[in-house]
Amino acid sequence: LSGIDTGFYRYYDPLNHEIDHAGLMTDLTHMPNDSMVLFQMVGHNPTATDPSVEQWKEMSSILRKKNVLVFFDMAYQGFASGCLETDAFAVRHFIEEGHKVVFAQSYSKNMGMYSVRVGGVTFMNEVREEKEAILKTLKHLNMCSFGAPPIHGSQVVEEVYSSPALLASW
């Protein structure tokens, strides 16, 4: 990323096949204030290992003190626990705790629409000027990327989510 300082945080302990809890919390604690962190959640790619509810809460507490923008990438909602609600815990918790959150969600995999690339991005932020700047940037990126994406994939997702019978069947 041009002009952006990037870093890494420890996440997975390959010897024990689990979250590197101590390393992860240490690295998050030492992040610069007012920075951004990206989490791939539920069915974490490529490890398929996710933090526990308690670990997410601890991560939230650390990052809230540092005013970090938290970016969640969720492509596999429903795959980790089998429940859409359970798999959305981290995003909802961070929002409830007052974080600035960016949430990218894909339906391409969990709805079996691989070639359609259906998804969306949500921003949770209380600062009006920041919201307006983000929206302006997103509109620009959208026009530069694809302008007018096909609508049928989003219509399928809307139909499934709007129908209790289809949602239960899915």
Q: Predicted segment positions?
A:
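Substrate-binding/gating loop at the entrance of the active-site cleft, primarily
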Residues: 1-5
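Conserved core segment of the aminotransferase class I/II
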Residues: 96-170
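Active-site phosphate-binding strand-loop segment of PLP-dependent enzymes
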Residues: 13-79
